[in-house]
Amino acid sequence: MESSKKMDAAGTLQPNPPLKLQPDRGAGSVLVPEQGGYKEKFVKTVEDKYKCEKCRLVLCNPKQTECGHRFCESCMAALLSSSSPKCTACQESIIKDKVFKDNCCKREILALQVYCRNEGRGCAEQLTLGHLLVHLKNECQFEELPCLRADCKEKVLRKDLRDHVEKACKYREATCSHCKSQVPMIKLQKHEDTDCPCVVVSCPHKCSVQTLLRSELSAHLSECVNAPSTCSFKRYGCVFQGTNQQIKAHEASSAVQHVNLLKEWSNSLEKKVSLLQNESVEKNKSIQSLHNQICSFEIEIERQKEMLRNNESKILHLQRVIDSQAEKLKELDKEIRPFRQNWEEADSMKSSVESLQNRVTELESVDKSAGQAARNTGLLESQLSRHDQMLSVHDIRLADMDLRFQVLETASYNGVLIWKIRDYKRRKQEAVMGKTLSLYSQPFYTGYFGYKMCARVYLNGDGMGKGTHLSLFFVIMRGEYDALLPWPFKQKVTLMLMDQGSSRRHLGDAFKPDPNSSSFKKPTGEMNIASGCPVFVAQTVLENGTYIKDDTIFIKVIVDTSDLPDP
């Protein structure tokens, strides 16, 4: 069987190297359709066990499910891409990890006999499916192949390729009858008409020389007596053309005309010089304007540098403030340590009290008429009373220090509050029962010397939202540096309920303070009247979404500090 050929540099046909195949990740090199099963024409009717349960074509790279049904690899990938894949044959759920390659079935399918794809062009071959690609790539004489010449775009059957390349291809090499050079057949006529140096041509100026080679034409034109020429005063406006003899006669007889042309050209040149001078003046003005702009830019740059230096000094000041706060935290930690020790002592005292109470109980069971027992009981009761008083004092001091430490630990100084509310169900039930209608957050600040604020929430709603919504409010508190801040409060406020799910669909509302509202005046008490949203979010939305996790919700308050001046 004749293989395909290719041309070498001299135009001779050479054996064509074997074409590279696309290996399938299995046995051999086979045709793999992009989607679904094989569409080949099989010699015998294919059994149903070799057909895909989805596309009903012959299986390509068969995969078998746990339920025993087979699918093409691409069809299985399409099924597994759905959220709940099911077998199209029995509707059983498909588990990806339990789908496996059916290599036995694959080998049986590749051994099935098929007709060549070029049967319609005359190929009568019957071969196994696994050998079809090799047959089409290297053997089939009825496979269409591109011409071996790079410029030719025609496709011919493999059996006709040699004749096409040698006899019919428009880009085959042909020999010029004049210069004997090799030229593609499609370009031969153009070569002879315009390019061949050995073709005989005549002078285009119809001089006495009638025949000469195209290669000699250029040299002849430079010497031809009939070659047209122009007057040497052409650049000044003279349009006369003629032979060399006519040009000499013209220049001798037209001296006055040429002088006039020179005068006109000189006048035109003077006008151009004047225009250039005017343009030069305008350019100088533009240069001066640019110089002034550069000076103003330099002044602005110096001003920006000064602002930068001021900002650096502010940053240093803030760093010192931060260091000071860190020192205060360390001091607070030192102050808390004794209270921790007191707490441990209190625990010890509690055990002592319990022991004393046990002793009192024992003594009370003894004969109450015994005088000594009565005195001992009175002494023990007085000791017990003193211990209870000391424990109460310790409890109060520890609670106060714990509260102060929590406030300092959770305070934010950038205008952003993230408030974590635990035990949502219990706290909401207390609100429903009227025990604790609202909760206040820890304070937060717009800066170390800025506004002091907090949030207030009604878990069972307030006003219009009572019993149906969560109500959320913003509160201005009296701060240490209120005297240095601008009033009324004007910063934009954003209230937000945070979504704890992966979609992060937070619920939020924003408002600009009303300068006439008493809620945003300078506080005269501990805090102003709260302002916000009585119907911030419906309780059904809150409790049925992903806003509650581990019986906890998160509320976020953002105060815009971008235009806030330093105190």
Swiss-Prot record:
A zinc finger (TRAF-type) spans 134-189, 190-248. This is TNF receptor-associated factor 3. Changing residue 473 to Y: Loss of interaction with MAVS. It comes from the Eukaryota. The MATH/TRAF domain binds to receptor cytoplasmic domains. The Ring-type zinc finger domain is required for its function in down-regulation of NFKB2 proteolytic processing. GO terms for molecular function: identical protein binding; protein kinase binding; protein phosphatase binding; thioesterase binding; tumor necrosis factor receptor binding; ubiquitin protein ligase activity; ubiquitin protein ligase binding; zinc ion binding. Homotrimer. Heterotrimer with TRAF2 and TRAF5. Interacts with LTBR/TNFRSF3, TNFRSF4, TNFRSF5/CD40, TNFRSF8/CD30, TNFRSF13C TNFRSF17/BCMA, TLR4 and EDAR. Interacts with MAP3K5, MAP3K14, TRAIP/TRIP, TDP2/TTRAP, TANK/ITRAF and TRAF3IP1. Interaction with TNFRSF5/CD40 is modulated by TANK/ITRAF, which competes for the same binding site. Interacts with TICAM1. Interacts with TRAFD1. Interacts with OTUB1, OTUB2 and OTUD5. Interacts with RNF216, OPTN and TBK1. Identified in a complex with TRAF2, MAP3K14 and BIRC3. It comes from Mus musculus. GO terms for cellular component: CD40 receptor complex; cytoplasmic side of plasma membrane; endosome membrane; mitochondrion. Detected in bone marrow macrophages and spleen B-cells (at protein level). In adult, highest in brain. Also found in kidney, heart, thymus, spleen, lung, muscle, testis and ovary. Not found in liver. There is a cross-link at residues 55, 123 (Glycyl cysteine thioester (Cys-Gly) (interchain with G-Cter in ubiquitin)). It is an enzyme of class 2 (transferase).
